[in-house]
Design a protein with these regions (language model features):
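Solvent-exposed, flexible loop/coil segments flanking beta-strands in beta-rich domains
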Residues: 112-172, 243-269
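Noncatalytic modules at the cell exterior or secretory-pathway interfaces
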Residues: 160-163, 224-241
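Histidine-centered active-site/metal-ligand motif
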Residues: 38, 170-175, 238-240
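Beta-sandwich interaction modules
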Residues: 200-232
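Exoplasmic/lumenal beta-rich domain surfaces
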Residues: 185-204
Length: 269
């Protein structure tokens, strides 16, 4: 009898705690796991306040239950990665309990201050900024892969210590792959069928929510990618079917080590 009473008491307390969850309790979880993409400058609908978040409560519940969000596929029991997007079971359960309890608003003045986001993750002025010519998507019934070959104008070799790819139109840029053409001989392929990006080696890429690539740049560990003078940067941009007529001007912002910097370990992507 005592055991049954204890079980009933625990269930009662658990139910009460779930019912007491309000936005202030889950806001930190959204700020930690979601708003790096879900903000006014990101690819997803913003989750920066109660109204924006609660409007999508059902979609959030489905995405969490299906393990679709945060978007991260690797199995952490095998290996771990930098910039992982795991959400803990405790955090996940708390959001689901909040939603099942009616996504209660509560006193939003007690919620933490939202993080501040800007158009660029790296706000310093880049050493080199290359922007594709304004392009009108030709992806009607099929996805379109378009390659833009952008001259760097470099008069000497430089070593990259960071770069940021910025989607010009986040609504239609599915992903971007960046290669370096050291001879500077590549040309644009605007056909929509540029499936094999040209170039001698990869600089990196971009997908929604991806942070800038920033290499360690202070002793004892300095790393970077060398770009030879007169090279071109080739951007392969993937536009999804149905985006025809939409315009885009995606760019890449590159930051170099000062000329003459020594002790930099080469990075091969």
């Amino acid at each position: 009898m005592k055991k049954n009473v204890l079980i009933i008491f625990v269930l009662f307390i658990t139910t009460q705690l779930s019912a007491q969850l309000t936005y202030k309790d889950v806001a930190p979880i959204f700020y930690k796991n979601c708003t790096s993409c879900h903000n006014e400058f990101g690819h997803g609908m913003p989750f920066m306040n109660y109204t924006q978040t609660s409007n999508y409560a059902t979609s959030i519940e489905i995405a969490l239950n299906e393990n679709e969000m945060p978007p991260w596929s690797p199995d952490s029991s095998y290996t771990r990665f930098t910039h992982e997007r795991y959400i803990s079971k405790t955090e996940k359960d708390m959001i689901l309990d909040w939603i099942s309890g009616g996504a209660t608003k509560g006193d939003t003045t007690k919620a933490p201050v939202p993080p501040v986001y800007t158009k660029y993750h790296i706000n310093a002025t880049p050493d080199l900024e290359l922007t594709i010519p304004t392009f009108t998507s030709n992806a009607s019934n099929d996805d379109s892969y378009v390659c833009f070959s952008l001259p760097t104008g470099l008069t000497q070799d430089r070593i990259v210590k960071a770069f940021e790819i910025v989607a010009g139109n986040p609504a239609i840029v599915h992903h971007v792959i960046v290669n370096v053409d050291t001879l500077g001989t590549t040309t644009d392929d605007l056909s929509g069928k540029c499936y094999q990006i040209t170039g001698d080696f990869s600089l990196g890429g971009f997908a929604p929510g991806a942070p800038p690539t920033i290499f360690p740049s202070r002793a004892p560990l300095k790393m970077g990618i060398r770009i030879k003078k007169s090279s071109k940067i080739v951007l392969q941009v993937h536009y999804p079917a149905g985006s025809v007529g939409e315009k885009d001007n995606t760019k890449i912002r590159i930051y170099f080590y000062p000329v003459g910097t020594t002790g930099i370990r080469p990075v091969v992507v």
